Amino acid sequence: MLGQRDILLHLVGLMEEYKIPYLLTGSFAVSYYGFPRATHDIDFVVEIHLAEKSNILKLLQRLGPGFDYDEKLVVKAIESFRQFAVFHFDTGIKVDFWIRKPGEFERNKFKRSRIIKIGNKHIAAVSAEDLILTKLVWCKQIRSERHLRDCVGIIKTQQKQLDRKYLKLWAKKLRVVEFLAEVKESDYSGY
């Protein structure tokens, strides 16, 4: 039976084969940079344009039995820079593919990506700073204690490695300065 890590590695291999630029994000990235947390999903940001939709559709067809997705929703997600999901019913794992939106911050995520190692595979992941900023932007829309807790864990774990100048600059540009101050001053146990 496939596990979450097996599915992650399988997908990364296929994205590399089909030359689809990707970043691992979400709970896997949070667990790598901060405090681990259990989840039944895998999140990727993918850079794909409508003209290249056949690549992602071919990749999805190669996933194998047990995986389910809606091809129309995939195309719609690419057209509207949204997200689509793939489900693996045997394990209950959901894989979210977030289409990279236009804009400087979103482009920066790919320029500033980090290579992390999971198993024997090198995987492109969102940087710790961009993961924090993304979660704070989501909190600006709908406050989430889980996202704030994730940010606290990343900041506490990555203290010396964080590019604080970049965080401060982009917190201002993204209008999340108050959230950044809140998580920098927070005690993890207080959430």
Q: Residues of each region from the PLM?
A:
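Compositionally biased terminal segments of proteins
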Residues: M1-Y191
